[in-house]
């Protein structure tokens, strides 16, 4: 299925690219989220008319994400308290939601989907550097300190 991208999508393309994707990916992800439209003659004309508006929106989103990244980088270590055993092993774990809530409480809005924990949830006390991806092109690192309650 050929679609026109309305946003930059990792490993697929940039705004305005006509790409061929599997029908299920287009129907279930790209089209419902407004990230693409079906590539037919009418939609190509509509897209070309809206191209400047979409590029301006994309630039504004990128600038907002860069601003949030600076605020996150400027934060001191975010402290999360959790119940832990004697050797510093947590009885539960600290996941993406806990980190996002702690950063939001510190004053910078952060969604749990933006937090990247490639090795899984944090299961011990200590200091960690957690990557947050605010935009496809903007990443930042937040310092998280997990302490025992």
Swiss-Prot record:
Question: Which SUPFAM superfamilies does its entry note?
Answer: L9 N-domain-like (SSF55658), Ribosomal protein L9 C-domain (SSF55653)
Which Pfam family name is an example for this entry? Ribosomal_L9_N
Q: Which Gene3D superfamilies match?
A: Ribosomal protein L9, C-terminal domain, Ribosomal protein L9, N-terminal domain
Biological-process GO terms, alphabetical: translation
Q: Which family does it belong to?
A: Belongs to the bacterial ribosomal protein bL9 family.
What is this protein's function?
Answer: Binds to the 23S rRNA.
Q: What is this protein called?
A: Large ribosomal subunit protein bL9
Organism of this sequence:
Shewanella amazonensis (strain ATCC BAA-1098 / SB2B)
């Amino acid at each position: 299925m050929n679609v026109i991208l309305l946003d930059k999508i990792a490993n697929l393309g940039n705004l305005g690219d006509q790409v061929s994707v599997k029908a299920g990916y287009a129907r279930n992800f790209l089209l419902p989220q407004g990230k693409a439209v079906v590539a037919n003659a009418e939609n190509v004309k509509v897209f070309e008319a809206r191209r400047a508006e979409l590029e301006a929106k994309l630039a504004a989103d990128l600038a907002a994400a860069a601003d949030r990244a600076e605020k996150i980088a400027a934060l001191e270590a975010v402290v999360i308290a959790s119940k832990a055993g004697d050797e510093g092993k947590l009885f539960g774990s600290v996941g993406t939601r806990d980190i996002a809530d702690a950063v939001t409480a510190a004053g910078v809005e952060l969604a749990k989907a933006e937090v990247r924990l490639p090795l899984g949830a944090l299961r011990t006390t200590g200091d960690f550097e957690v990557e947050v991806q605010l935009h496809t092109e903007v990443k930042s690192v937040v310092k998280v300190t997990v302490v025992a309650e």
